[in-house]
Amino acid sequence: MRAIACAVSVAVVLFIFIVSPYIPTTDCIHMGKMQSMDSSGLRASSDGRIDPTQVFLNIPSTDRLRKYLEYYSSGAHVAGINRTQAEYTDAFFKAHGIDSKIVEYFPWMNYPVDQRVTLFNESTQEIKFAASLKEDVIPGDPLSEDPNNLPAFHGYSADGNVTGQLVYANYGTVDDFEALRKAGISVEGKVVLVRYGYVFRGIKVQAAEMHGARGILIYSDPADDGYGKGAAYPDGPWRAESSIQRGSVMRLQVYPGDPLTPGYASTEDAPRIDPKDAKNINHIPSIPLSYRDAEPLLRSLEGSGKLASDLGSSWVGGLTQRGVEYWTGPSELSVNILNKVEYKKTAIQNVIGRIKGSEDSEHAVIIGNHRDAWCAGASDPSSGSAALMELAYAFGELMKFGWRPRRTIILASWDAEEYGLVGSTEWVEDKIDWLRTNAIAYINVDSAVSGSSFHVESSPVFRKLLHEVTKLVTYPYSKESVYDAWLRESHANASSGDKGEDDDGSGGDSDGDEDDDKGDGSDSKTSKPKKDKPLMRPLGSGSDYTAFMAHAGVSSVSIGFGGSTGAYHSNYDSPKRLTTFIDPEMKLHQAMVRIWGLLTIKLADDPVIGLSPVSYAKEIRRYIRQLEKTSARHLNATAADRLPNKRAGAIVAGKLRHLRSAQRQLLISAHLVEHDRQHLRAIYGEDCQMKSRRRHASCLKLRDSINDRVFGMERHFIDPEGIPGREWFKHILVSPGRWLGYGSQIFPALAEAIEDGDWRRFQALAKSNVETIYEAAWFLREV
């Protein structure tokens, strides 16, 4: 790893001068014209403040974005390795008028030393196959041959050398292991081979460990993101046969961040728990494989155990096109996994920029993207890093014209996201008291561009603002608005039954019904999405919004253009692939900067914060319907040890009624906030500009009250006790699913009590959740 660190030698100051100069694009020419309008080109509102919206939309440059993308994709930038990029980011912020500093933490992380996978005859010790664990060099793509590329490796994987017969376990979900058990196939003492998809990879390792496996291999099947989807790289965007998906295998659903400092920041002198006591770490070795390396292993299973198709059609992957038959095993031959890794306390660097608010500097809108990557990481995360840099540039230009946001804007470039959201989690744990008092919202962009479809995961409170902003930005490849493209594609995906990888849909999609309800909280006849509203997914985990939303109770949203995951976490997630097949003209990147920037400006600069408690309250009604479906699905299948099933059903029905009553009160309170907002506009005006000091003071008091209630609502869904068994997660409405990892679970504590058949626990938690919702309702009524 020293070689990797030494190889990273970018001249920070020189690069700033290369990337940052004003490039004469049409956007910039427009900016030049604007300087002659009212000396700045910026309109002033009735209170004399500058309105930056239209000027901002003309700033983002595709040329600059391309340069940023090339820089952030270059050189090794695994977490804790590339301090140079942190220093560049810090210097860039400062060069554009943004106060900035590097904030270090010291988590416990692992790095690869030696990885091997062999198939052999245990009696004769004859090796039948040795996995290459290498990715091919692609002519014309220089980053595919970078000697510093990371080996096939899992972050937070266990050090170990294990041998066992091979068993194929499909996607490695808990249901898949249960299907093997029912079929009479044991994984005890075996090495398990599973496919990527449906659930987070760390859960696959955990499930294998729970069932007694000695080790696990995770491969990318071509049916999921390879030639089964289309032409493979370099002929198309989908996964090449030698492509390897790296990634973390932390138990992310238990708690993210540094394993040895759960719930508090990993400062250099912070106390650490013993690694053996870390609950978010698995204990069996794991290694990722390409489907080229997986093919001989699957062939070794043919004729052993059960035909995989006997367990379900979903058990059969895309290698059938190469003549492979999918069998469960166990194999006659043995598999050896050597995963030698080094764990150590490692310095990581977050870069935190700050634009101080002109009127309300204590309250802040936070925007963030992670900087670290397993490989080049052009889409994940460098497309987002490029967007963040262009936002910093744009804000700097606006400040040259005299603009300052009403509230503070914090720009965060996170480190160590790939290992388990480490950089952002440590910062949130470090700043938790300040965040719970002063943070208005967190806006996350991870992969800004990995495809062409606009995707949103969000707290429902953002719905109306997202609609407003996306209607202002043109979708580059059809000339409709991003909102219209989002609406069209989200409903096309819904009608085709499309489900994203690592999500079983348990969180569902938001149906966007904020405009068709009378406020009575009654259930609609259908949960199908409305035709005139785009879909939003609830937040689970898998990116840097997690600690903000699920731990601190800060309303969060994550946005990006997605669709193709065919190079995810591989050497082929390169600028060459991204600009050949996904965004040749960098216009999707430009659109993302515009959306991200407008969301930030509106939240930081509008007199009244544009978050919608009404949208949230209505969405909770749908959450309750989802919980009702969960209970119906599990009630008869789960043995109720403490109470008869009939009694359990009555308990659930009663608590659901109480939840609905609380939701109705919340909705009434949310409408009162909206009434106050309308009253402010009608009587005073949002700018509160009037000659009478008394009326001015009354206006400011009402406006501050509205804003405090609007952004404070999310905090009231935080339960200090957390979810039983994974107490770090404290949001009562959404969290990553216990057996999903990425995907969201609605009313997680209640859903897990139902799944466990623990009806007494369910009663206690439901009572607490009902009280929490009532408390949120009363908070919204405070003036």
Residue positions per predicted region:
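Noncatalytic luminal/extracellular "stalk/propeptide" segments of secretory-pathway proteins
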Residues: 32-55, 67-188, 222, 237-256
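Second-shell loop/turn segments in exported
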Residues: 51-59, 73-82, 152-157, 191-198, ...
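Structural recognition of the beta-strand scaffold that forms the well-ordered cores
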Residues: 68-71, 102, 166-168, 191-195, ...
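Extracellular/luminal Protease-associated
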Residues: 139-278, 285, 376, 380, ...
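Soluble metallo-hydrolase cores and metallopeptidase-like ectodomains found primarily
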Residues: 148-179, 256-378, 393, 397-401, ...
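Metal-dependent peptidase/peptidase-like ectodomains
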Residues: 245-305, 360, 416-574, 579, ...
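Alpha-helical metal-binding/catalytic segments enriched in His/Glu/Asp
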Residues: 351, 367-421, 426, 596
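C-terminal amphipathic alpha-helical interaction region
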Residues: 699, 703-783
